[in-house]
Regions:
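Post-HExxH zinc-binding segment in Zn-dependent metallohydrolases
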Residues: 106-141
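Active-site recognition of the HExxH zinc-binding catalytic motif
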Residues: 87-100
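Short pre-active-site segment immediately N-terminal to the catalytic Zn-binding motif
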Residues: 73-88
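Auxiliary, metal-adjacent structural segments of Zn-dependent hydrolase domains
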Residues: 7-70
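Charge-rich, solvent-exposed alpha-helical interaction surfaces
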Residues: 32, 36-39, 92, 121, ...
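Amphipathic alpha-helical coiled-coil segments
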Residues: 145-152
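Sec-exported extracytoplasmic/periplasmic mature domains
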Residues: 41-45, 98, 119-126
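Second-shell loop/turn segments in exported
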Residues: 21-28, 79, 101-105
Length: 152
């Protein structure tokens, strides 16, 4: 097999090999992100996350995904709640994955599909976590997102 026939899945695996997810920012920001990453590990999504996201960087502006850099720019408020932050990181990783796969969908549809993955993550974390506090927060976030979808 030549190097050009590896495909997106092979590129993702190659990108993941030996690569650590970088966290850049203040000590408090880094501590909060690492707390969220522990939850990503509990749910079994860490390898997936680091395959598609290479850096989580603290910024003063609006939290956003930089697809071209595979970087999440997050402000300090985005990482205050570790369960919500973990689910956001997984959602963004799915968004990057869909871009890598070349899905030709409307931007809103990509957001919606990656959002569905966020809910799947919360359900999986709720199943796998031993912490009642984490389970309650997963339940609260799922309920909140379900209610907000009903409005639209």
């Amino acid at each position: 097999m030549d190097d050009f026939s590896v495909g997106v899945e092979g590129m993702s695996r190659a990108a993941c090999r030996g690569r650590r997810l970088r966290v850049e920012g203040s000590p408090d920001f880094r501590a909060r992100v690492h707390e969220a990453l522990k939850l990503v590990r509990v749910a079994g999504y860490y390898d997936f996350l680091r395959t598609h996201i290479k850096c989580i960087r603290e910024i003063d502006g609006l939290t956003q995904l930089r697809v071209s850099e595979a970087t999440i720019w997050a402000n300090k408020y985005a990482v205050e709640n570790p369960v919500d932050a973990a689910s956001r990181f997984v959602q963004e990783a799915h968004y990057v994955q869909m871009h890598l796969e070349g899905r030709q969908l409307h931007e809103g549809m990509l957001e919606y599909l990656s959002f569905e993955k966020r809910i799947e993550f919360l359900k999986r974390l709720m199943e796998r976590s031993r912490s009642q506090e984490v389970k309650r927060e997963c339940e609260r976030l799922i309920r909140m997102w379900d209610e907000s979808l009903l409005i639209y």
